[in-house]
Amino acid sequence: MKVVFVSSEIYPFAKTGGLADITGALPRKIASQGVKVFGFMPLYKTVDINKHGIIKIDASVDVNLNNRVYTFEVYKKIDDATFFFLKNDELFGRDYLYGPPEGDYPDNDIRFGSFCYAVMEFIKRENLNPDLIHVNDWQTALIPVLNYHKYNNHHVRTVITIHNLAYQGIFDKFAIERLNLGWDLFHMEALEYYDKVNFLKGGIVFSSAITTVSPTYAKEITFPEYGYGLDGVLRKYSNKLYGILNGIDYDVWNPETDKYIYENYCVFTIQKKSINKKLFLKEVGLKDEAKPLYIFIGRLAHQKGVDLIRDSIEEMSKMPANFAILGTGDKGYNDFFKSIEGKYENIFIKVDYNEAFSRKMYAAADFLLMPSLFEPCGLNQMIAMRYGTLVVARDTGGLKDTVKDVSQPDGYGILFKNPIKDEFLNALYRAVELYNNKKLFESLQKKVMEIDFSINNTAKKYIKLYESLKYSREVKI
């Protein structure tokens, strides 16, 4: 089987968030199980081609759009899968992938629309002849539209994965003309969305299958609360909507081999985790290692429940616990957390993101905080548990699928239902009680380290989906 896998970011080449982590790990794992995989990504200015061994090949692709010709040079890297990188410096030779902190680039429709065309042209010209094309999020969502309407590849199945429905790629209606899509696609059953063009909607309508990154999120997005205006469309196409839980690469996230943490350990030497805690507290200036250490790692954004942390900070400062917060994001949150750096003796704050430092945090912590308003899947909780860190999270999306409250039989985490301050604080206090029950706490640390959240499980389910689509069988995953 041959699969083309397309994403706007793929780790380790380019990353702004969890999308890159999963699109970096998944195609490689699928390829390792016997599928021929061709990955595609724009070649951004920020990609270090020398570091990653990416080489230019004797190929280019021309895309005619908006009375312009956009020429893409082609670069290539071969590891577990074959990756192609399409380079156009006018469109992608910029400082950011999607736009500066102030907002998205205004020509993102042309940028990613032309990239989608370039992928399809390269597939055609190089006779890749894939059985299936797998695209991710709005940036690549025009590919199922083009595959069906422009290239008439009705035999080539397409899968679109929705990693976060909040981002849809919505542009003014004249994007239809700029992208040579034709006004016959500007209607409610295609790309039209409240008199605008919606890339993600097009991908949903014209794909052979829709996947999301957890079973619970697949259900949630068919309701208005989580549907971001597309819940009706998703209900209509629910017969081809599947929730496949993301996973993490256990070779990348492994406390036994992680070169960034203070002391390596495994489930059999978990007592060494306390060395990581002691040295981390010393590094950041926190005291009393006998207290539980809570960490937050992530985007400082409304979606991540950062308001709950901000509004609870005074109460947190009085708890018998230490806190470490690492993240950057929206300016308002950045400014707030910078303003209280060093204010509380039990709260360390670093408004930044550094993966090496985050690994030290995972290895040192007793609890990870994930108070998200919604969470399509979440990888942080899986990473935390891999490192023997228990999770305090809101009962939503992928968190519901991966964290089981200790009040339940075989539970191993702390969940709270509503995104309100009192419930969040109650969850923190419940975690303190759990921590003080040393025998139970230590047994749960070992338990979560042995739960299998490997990307291998995700890859196997996608291969089943691909085969079902290729052979027009009933999908059973």
Curated annotation (Swiss-Prot):
<comment type="function">
    <text>Synthesizes alpha-1,4-glucan chains using ADP-glucose.</text>
</comment>
<dbReference type="Pfam" id="PF00534">
    <property type="entry name" value="Glycos_transf_1"/>
</dbReference>
<dbReference type="Pfam" id="PF08323">
    <property type="entry name" value="Glyco_transf_5"/>
</dbReference>
<dbReference type="GO" id="GO:0009011">
    <property type="term" value="F:alpha-1,4-glucan glucosyltransferase (ADP-glucose donor) activity"/>
</dbReference>
<keyword id="KW-0328">Glycosyltransferase</keyword>
<dbReference type="InterPro" id="IPR013534">
    <property type="entry name" value="Starch_synth_cat_dom"/>
</dbReference>
<comment type="pathway">
    <text>Glycan biosynthesis; glycogen biosynthesis.</text>
</comment>
<dbReference type="InterPro" id="IPR001296">
    <property type="entry name" value="Glyco_trans_1"/>
</dbReference>
<dbReference type="GO" id="GO:0005978">
    <property type="term" value="P:glycogen biosynthetic process"/>
</dbReference>
<keyword id="KW-0320">Glycogen biosynthesis</keyword>
<comment type="similarity">
    <text>Belongs to the glycosyltransferase 1 family. Bacterial/plant glycogen synthase subfamily.</text>
</comment>
<protein>
    <recommendedName>
        <fullName>Glycogen synthase</fullName>
        <ecNumber>2.4.1.21</ecNumber>
    </recommendedName>
</protein>
<dbReference type="GO" id="GO:0004373">
    <property type="term" value="F:alpha-1,4-glucan glucosyltransferase (UDP-glucose donor) activity"/>
</dbReference>
<keyword id="KW-0808">Transferase</keyword>
<dbReference type="InterPro" id="IPR011835">
    <property type="entry name" value="GS/SS"/>
</dbReference>
<feature type="binding site">
    <location>
        <position position="15"/>
    </location>
    <ligand>
        <name>ADP-alpha-D-glucose</name>
    </ligand>
</feature>
